[in-house]
């Protein structure tokens, strides 16, 4: 049987705490000592072929330096084991810009880190760049169903909720919200965009500089291509949203809106 072992390099990805996966107190992978012991045992096995070293330090990483530290740890462990891996899976985590003016990963610096490693090790490299490919390919379109004035803010209650886009409620991720129709109008003083679910965490964004909205207006929740649909659920007995593919002038329905009878 061909297998791989996931190594925990004890590297801080400098990302959202809940999606950091490469520190020693995270549940993923094995530490250096255990990894070396496993490789030593598997070298002698007649039935198990160790093929791959795998590592993944987290998601939504926007700085090349954590990758640099991770690569140094991988290089060190390979030299310590003196084992020739057919594959080294360097994971993913390459971040995108979710907020206006948010820093993005410098791919030139990232590639130089990888290039240096490749020159030292004759092995095939595997990457998992999911978010960086599809993250900005989708938007969630929502309608304003109610405006609720409350103390010092206005709640903009949308017809989408945390069941449709879980990231903000799950770990405080920020997604830009834009009006579908931009008009010159008075800016809001304090909008809080929320869903209609019975959870305080059913909140998307607070904005102090948004165009004035009315019931029935449409907004975009941006960059939902990664972990949007895959994290969606029927929580609160809410049917899942439809998914539509737009390719230039062509429109294709990928998933129809769920009906209540499909859930029950």
Task: Please place each PLM-identified region on the residue numbering.
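Acidic/histidine-enriched ion/cofactor-binding microenvironments in catalytic or ligand-binding pockets
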Residues: 1, 76-79, 83-85, 105-120, ...
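Active-site-proximal beta-alpha core segment in soluble small-molecule metabolic enzymes
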Residues: 1-87, 96, 113
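Generic beta-structure capping elements
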Residues: 6-10, 93, 161, 196
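Short acidic, glycine/serine/threonine-rich loops at helix termini
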Residues: 13-20, 64-66, 98-103, 136-140, ...
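General structural feature for long, well-ordered alpha-helical segments within catalytic domains
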Residues: 31-38, 49, 63-73, 86, ...
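Flexible loop residues that form catalytic
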Residues: 58, 93, 224
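Charged (often Lys/Glu-rich) extended helix/loop segments that serve as interaction or gating elements
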Residues: 113, 122-264
């Amino acid at each position: 049987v061909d297998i791989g072992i996931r190594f925990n390099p004890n590297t801080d990805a400098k990302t959202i705490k809940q999606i950091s996966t490469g520190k020693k107190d995270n549940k993923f992978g094995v530490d250096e000592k255990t990894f070396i012991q496993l490789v030593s045992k598997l070298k002698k096995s007649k039935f198990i072929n160790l093929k791959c070293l795998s590592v993944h330090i987290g998601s939504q990483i926007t700085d090349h330096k954590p990758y640099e530290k991770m690569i140094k740890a991988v290089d060190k462990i390979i030299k310590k084991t003196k084992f020739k891996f057919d594959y080294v899976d360097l994971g993913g985590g390459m971040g995108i810009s979710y907020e206006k003016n948010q820093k993005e990963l410098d791919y030139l610096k990232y590639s130089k880190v990888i290039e240096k490693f490749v020159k030292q090790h004759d092995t095939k490299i595997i990457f998992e760049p999911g978010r960086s490919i599809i993250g900005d390919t989708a938007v969630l379109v929502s309608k304003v169903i109610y405006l609720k004035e409350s103390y010092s803010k206005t709640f903009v209650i949308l017809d989408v909720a945390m069941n449709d886009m879980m990231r903000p409620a799950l770990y405080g991720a920020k997604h830009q919200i834009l009006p579908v129709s931009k008009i010159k109008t008075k800016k809001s003083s304090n909008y809080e965009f929320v869903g209609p679910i019975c959870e305080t965490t059913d909140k998307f964004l607070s904005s102090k500089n948004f165009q004035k909205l009315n019931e029935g207006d449409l907004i975009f929740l941006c960059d939902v291509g990664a972990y949007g649909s895959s994290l969606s659920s029927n929580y609160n007995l809410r049917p899942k949203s439809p998914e539509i593919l737009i390719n230039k002038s062509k429109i294709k329905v990928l998933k129809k809106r769920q009906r209540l009878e499909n859930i029950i």
